Every structure is written in C-alpha cells, then in structure tokens.
Amino acid sequence: TGALLLDGNTLNYFGKIFLPDGLLDRYQAFELIHARKPEDFEKYQAFELIHAR
C-alpha cells in the first residue's frame, strides 16, 4: 500500500514542493506512485513508438 512508501527518503523527494497540501491526500498520491508497470503497458508502449516516428 501507499503507507509503506512513507519513509524519510520518499517524503524528502515527494515533499510539499511536488505534493502540496490540498492537491492530493498524501496516502492517495502514494497509491499512484508505486513504480509498477500498468496492466496495459504494451498498448501504451506501442502508442509511444508510433508517436516517436
């Protein structure tokens, strides 16, 4: 879960500059920042290749 990512380094990197109060609740934001590929990554990758040409 996002709560597991709230260590000191993560809070220093994704601090108030990047996640200001009121924009997202910190726990909601860390659910989005999980460093996993999306389920449909291949589709997005194909679109990026087409866009890059």
From Swiss-Prot:
Q: Does the keyword Ion transport apply?
A: no
- Specify which residues bind chlorophyll b 1 according to the UniProt entry for this protein: F18
Q: What membrane topology was assigned to this protein in its record?
A: Multi-pass membrane protein
Gene Ontology cellular component list: chloroplast thylakoid membrane; photosystem I; photosystem II
Q: Which GO terms describe its biological process?
A: photosynthesis
Which GO molecular function terms does the record list? chlorophyll binding; metal ion binding
Instruction: Write out the residues that bind chlorophyll a 2.
Output: H51
Q: How is it modified after translation?
A: Photoregulated by reversible phosphorylation of its threonine residues.
* Ligand binding (chlorophyll a 1): E48
Its localization reads: Plastid, Chloroplast thylakoid membrane
Q: Which UniProt keywords apply?
A: Chlorophyll, Chloroplast, Chromophore, Magnesium, Membrane, Metal-binding, Phosphoprotein, Photosynthesis, Photosystem I, Photosystem II, Plastid, Thylakoid, Transmembrane
Q: How does it associate, per the subunit comment?
A: The LHC complex consists of chlorophyll a-b binding proteins.
Q: What is this protein called?
A: Chlorophyll a-b binding protein 1, chloroplastic
Q: What is the lineage of its organism?
A: Eukaryota, Viridiplantae, Streptophyta, Embryophyta, Tracheophyta
